[in-house]
């Protein structure tokens, strides 16, 4: 390196041209409109995937978030996949974790082999959930008309400026029959009558410390019985909630604070629609209510695997029952 090059690297203009200094009192919390945009409440109707050709349908809030898209939250992107019978699609993302839930239909997954690992092949049907680590794009081939919910952590990698090139967990399949059997066991447990949550967490033995479905993603299949009004809870992870099944009369109440009785003050109401989705921003109190006359089912997907590793999940419950 010559002297002029050294001078250019150590020059005042290069090292200090972009620096800024702020009064801490005015800059301590940049999460506000115009700076780091807050994550908004948002809901998507099942009409989004009810008709049309085979397509990937992103639930994109990147414009509101002020980040590259598609992104549903700063770290996660959710999509509906609509596949016509006999057709296929290749969902592609630079992501370490991809989660798929089969809302309806049936088909097959094929993914080519990678060095050190064999090709992947899986037959899937309604109610199944499967996760894939980093690797080649999978081909999803529909046997019957199908709707899948797909969530991945691509926006996080975009922000970090990195490529996913190493699998961090084993591809896994959670068949609907096994999930349903666990839910029925939960319902039959006498202690469930006193519980705030009738849900099963999906996990893997390779992630025993976090008890999550991947190292970044968290998934829970939950039941909300008729007549239930769940005490509020909150957490610092974002929730991308899929309404698996419900009748009118199911809803979620969301708000910033609790009153002296442990109820959400000035709550906003999100009415559920079967096959729809909504986002629960981090840090907000929320609780699910079922006044429909029938059991409802919910699948929240969160970035709680990452938050658990960072020790920043901070989950809290308004009452003593969990």
Give a label for each model feature.
Residues 1-73, 161-221, 231, 322:
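A short, N-terminal "cap"/entry segment at the start of jelly-roll beta-barrel domains
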Residues 2-42, 238-322:
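C-terminal functional regions that serve as terminal interaction/effector modules
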Residues 2-5, 143-189, 291-322:
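Double-stranded beta-helix
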Residues 12, 69-73, 86-100, 136-144, ...:
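Short, low-complexity cationic-aromatic patches
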Residues 56-67, 76-94, 218-238, 284:
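Conserved short histidine dyad/triad with adjacent acidic residue
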Residues 78-81, 108, 151-152, 219-222, ...:
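A structural feature that tracks compact, well-ordered secondary-structure segments
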Residues 84, 88-126, 243-274:
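A short beta-strand-loop-beta hairpin characteristic of the jelly-roll/cupin
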Residues 84, 103, 121-144, 151-154, ...:
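Conserved metal-binding segment of the jelly-roll/cupin
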């Amino acid at each position: 390196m010559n002297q002029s090059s050294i001078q250019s690297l150590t020059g005042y203009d290069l090292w200090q041209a972009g620096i800024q200094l702020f009064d801490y009192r005015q800059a301590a919390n940049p999460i506000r409109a115009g700076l780091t945009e807050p994550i908004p409440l948002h809901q998507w109707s099942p009409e989004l995937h009810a008709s049309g050709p085979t397509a990937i349908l992103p639930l994109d809030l990147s414009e509101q978030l002020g980040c590259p898209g598609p992104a549903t939250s700063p770290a996660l992107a959710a999509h509906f996949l609509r596949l016509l019978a006999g057709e296929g699609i290749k969902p592609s993302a630079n992501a370490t974790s991809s989660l798929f839930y089969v809302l309806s239909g049936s088909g097959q997954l094929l993914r080519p082999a990678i060095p050190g690992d064999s090709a992947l092949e899986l037959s899937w049907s309604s109610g199944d959930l499967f996760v894939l680590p980093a690797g080649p794009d999978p081909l999803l081939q529909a046997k019957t008309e199908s709707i899948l919910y797909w969530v991945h952590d691509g926006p996080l990698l975009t922000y970090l400026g990195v490529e996913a090139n190493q699998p961090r967990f084993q591809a896994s399949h959670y068949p609907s029959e096994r999930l349903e059997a666990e839910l029925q066991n939960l319902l039959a447990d006498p202690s469930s009558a006193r519980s705030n949550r009738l849900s099963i967490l999906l996990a893997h033995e390779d992630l025993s410390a976090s008890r999550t479905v991947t190292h970044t993603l968290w998934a829970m299949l939950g039941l909300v019985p008729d007549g239930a009004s769940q005490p509020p809870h909150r957490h610092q992870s974002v929730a991308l909630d899929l309404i698996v099944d419900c009748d009118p009369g199911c809803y979620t109440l969301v708000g910033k604070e609790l009153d002296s009785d442990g109820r959400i003050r000035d709550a906003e109401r999100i009415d559920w629609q079967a096959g729809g989705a909504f986002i629960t921003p981090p840090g907000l109190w929320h609780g699910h209510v079922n006044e429909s006359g029938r059991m409802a089912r919910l699948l929240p997907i969160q970035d709680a695997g990452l938050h658990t590793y960072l020790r920043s999940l901070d989950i809290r419950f308004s009452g003593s029952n969990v």
